[in-house]
Amino acid sequence: MLDTGTEQRTIEGSALRLIDAVLGQWASQGSSAMSARSLAIEAGVPVSSIYHHFGSLEHLYLAAQSHARAHAQRWCEDQLSQLDAVGPLSPAAFPTLLAALIDDWAENGRRMAFAWRECILAAAREPRFAVEIEAWRAIWTRFWGAVCDRCDRSGYGDLTALLFYNESLFHLIRWRRVIDRAALQDLCDGWSRWLAGELADEGPSRAAARTEAARTMPSLPVLGELSGRIAQAAAAVLQRDGLLGLTHRAVAAEASLTLGVVSHHVRTSADLVRAAFEMVYRTVAGGGATAPQPVRRTDAELVEVLVAFQNDAAPLRALDELLLAAARDPSLSGFVPQLRYLRGRTSALLL
């Protein structure tokens, strides 16, 4: 490290530019499309700067996670400060506040939101990121506990943090802004009623969005035994390598088929994504079962079950890949209403 103040500031500046490049590319394309070269070009520094400042690309990613969490913590503090300015709120204010906070995070905290999601995906492949996930979880547990306390919903912070885990991801996907925001409000209204021990209906905006999603469901190429085998392989590649790794060659290798066979049955990259979507959706939806079953658990037991489910459910990680890709890539807009509004057992477990 250099001694003079000017040189020290230059080093810090280039390191921060690299961190900013990581955050920008997490939001625009995801880790699977990133490289040391692309980050160095965006930051305007030589590739060697990554290794000079951070020692490795992985350590740069970890530094970017720490930076993102610091910004997320400031976002939380700002929201709580605004709440403190008006004093305690009644439980009736809770659903509107919950929807407003999720919406603000997805819009104004968008880069940090993508960083958090990339951390979750990275932990499935790199155990070192598991510690980072726990640091994120601690931020949200504290924040939602404080929000619930201010709305006379004390004791529901852990459960609401889990709802936020789910809905903040779905709300990153932009379909019809007005409908998306209204549907989010419907869900938060239902959540508040559920916490009060009441039945939670779907809500008019959410029901309308779900109906449209079902009506416009794309035709999906999973027809016969061979097509199903290809779709299973596509879902496995998606889970392991991300959307960038979802190629005809990778799927052929995963399915133990020739490239020619896969290319004949699934002709385009878009068809390959559709095949993976079909298999992941069927797995997560549980064969179409949508009616929620009664949950006979204490709140603490339910939190434990849901956290374990998030950590261990491989199909959900593949779905997360699709959700994040749809949030970034306009070419996947044909799947957006289905990804946002057609859900299976995962949501039924909560509502």
Which stretches of residues belong to each language-model region?
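Helix-turn-helix
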Residues: 27-63, 237-271, 275
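Hydrophobic/aromatic-rich alpha-helical bundle segments in the mid-to-C-terminal region
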Residues: 7, 130, 134, 147-208, ...
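Long compositionally biased, domain-poor regions of proteins
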Residues: 122, 150, 232-239, 249, ...
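Hydrophobic alpha-helical connector segments
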Residues: 74-110, 160, 288-316
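Generic hydrophobic, amphipathic alpha-helix propensity
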Residues: 14-22, 39, 64, 68, ...
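Amphipathic alpha-helical packing segments from all-alpha helical-bundle domains
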Residues: 108-117, 124-150, 312-320, 330-351
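Helix-loop "lid/cap" segments that line or gate small-molecule binding pockets
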Residues: 84, 99-107, 116-125, 191-195, ...
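Short, structured motif recognition centered on aromatic/hydrophobic residues
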Residues: 34, 72, 112-122, 133, ...
